[in-house]
């Protein structure tokens, strides 16, 4: 009897805690979604002693989705939700030729753990509309601590229409955030793919990318926050219309003293005008002390390599310098490349040093100089 009472009290307490946390979650969800250009809402649609019925709605300009399900309490909490196939855009899927789109969203917390575990899985589905046929491998979003880490796996896609086709392999994203929120890391892996569309044939090998961002100075009333960022990219082969463009690419770079406004602009990507992004970066370098280090950019093609490295950091009139090196045989079989290299050698922009071609580029407030010769124009 005592154990039963204790268990009942524990379930009741979990329900009370859940109600309080859910209300806070719903408010934060609504506030955050407005900034992102759509509306997210969460509500309880029913309740019992050991459960709560839930609905989470997502509304955008051209779509409406709703996840419904139940949270149950016992030795912790488990919530299971799925897309409502009769609500909003889901009801129209057959009109678009989408078949087999099913998902399950599972959120768990332990009895003595405050870290929620998340798993959202979308099963493989198909799209058949006219002569277009696509097969998607589904996706998985998982996290052992939704506030600090997560993994997204997209299980590839293949499409065909007429004589054209597109195929991508698995894509994996891993994201982690430090407990103090000042450092974040992201890793991505792509298994490669191919496209044969509009007369163009493209094939890519696997590539992987990693980046970090860390707050190095907190925002104050006098100063904006500053960040450091780093990127690493490694890519396999790339073929275009049956011609090997490159066998491998390696890129490593980092930036320091990056102002928050520039971080935000870069995060928005294509949503920000390139002119605005360029102006923000120029101001940060020329007036804010931002630095950019290109540690390595190496392209391998056949037996030849092309590499570049350098730094942008203003020091008086000097802005930065880069060195470019390539093997004489690099790109020798590419139409127009040997002629371009010969012209650069003739005007002194490329010179031979120990069997390799080199160019040293100096950037200053007075302009650009290559191998000591100032360029009239870029």
Regions found by a protein language model. Give the residues of each.
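Hydrophobic, proline/glycine-rich low-complexity stretches
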Residues: 1-2
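Glycine-rich, small/hydroxylated-residue low-complexity segments
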Residues: 5-378
């Amino acid at each position: 009897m005592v154990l039963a009472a204790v268990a009942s009290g524990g379930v009741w307490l979990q329900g009370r805690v859940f109600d309080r946390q859910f209300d806070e979650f719903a408010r934060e969800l609504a506030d955050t979604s407005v900034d992102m250009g759509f509306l997210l809402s969460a509500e309880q649609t029913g309740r019992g002693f050991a459960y709560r019925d839930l609905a989470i709605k997502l509304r955008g300009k051209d779509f409406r989705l709703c996840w419904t399900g139940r949270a149950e309490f016992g030795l912790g909490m488990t919530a299971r939700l799925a897309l409502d196939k009769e609500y909003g855009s889901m009801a129209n899927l057959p009109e678009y030729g989408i078949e087999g789109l099913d998902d399950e969203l599972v959120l768990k917390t332990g009895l003595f753990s405050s870290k929620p575990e998340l798993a959202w899985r979308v099963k493989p589905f198909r799209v058949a509309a006219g002569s277009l046929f696509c097969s998607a491998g589904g996706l998985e979003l998982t996290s052992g601590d939704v506030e600090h880490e997560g993994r997204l796996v997209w299980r590839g896609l293949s499409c065909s229409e007429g004589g054209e086709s597109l195929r991508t392999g698995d894509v994996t994203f891993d994201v982690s955030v430090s407990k103090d929120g000042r450092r974040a890391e992201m890793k991505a892996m792509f298994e490669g793919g191919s496209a044969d569309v509009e007369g163009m044939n493209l094939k890519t090998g696997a590539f992987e990318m990693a980046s970090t961002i860390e707050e190095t100075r907190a925002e104050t009333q006098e100063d904006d926050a500053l960040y450091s960022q780093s990127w690493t990219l490694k890519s396999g082969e790339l073929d275009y219309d049956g011609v090997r463009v490159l066998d491998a690419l390696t890129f490593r770079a980092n930036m320091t003293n990056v102002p928050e406004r520039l971080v935000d602009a870069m995060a928005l990507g294509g949503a920000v005008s390139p002119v605005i992004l360029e102006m923000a970066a120029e101001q940060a370098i020329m007036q804010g002390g931002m630095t950019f280090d290109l540690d390595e950019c190496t392209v391998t093609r056949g037996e030849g390599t092309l590499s570049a490295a350098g730094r942008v950091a203003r020091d008086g009139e000097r802005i930065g310098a880069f060195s470019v090196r390539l093997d004489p045989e690099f790109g020798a079989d590419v139409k127009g490349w040997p002629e371009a290299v010969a012209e650069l050698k003739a005007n002194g922009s490329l010179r031979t040093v120990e069997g390799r071609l080199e160019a040293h580029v100096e950037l200053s407030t007075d302009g650009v100089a290559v191998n000591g010769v100032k360029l009239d124009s870029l």
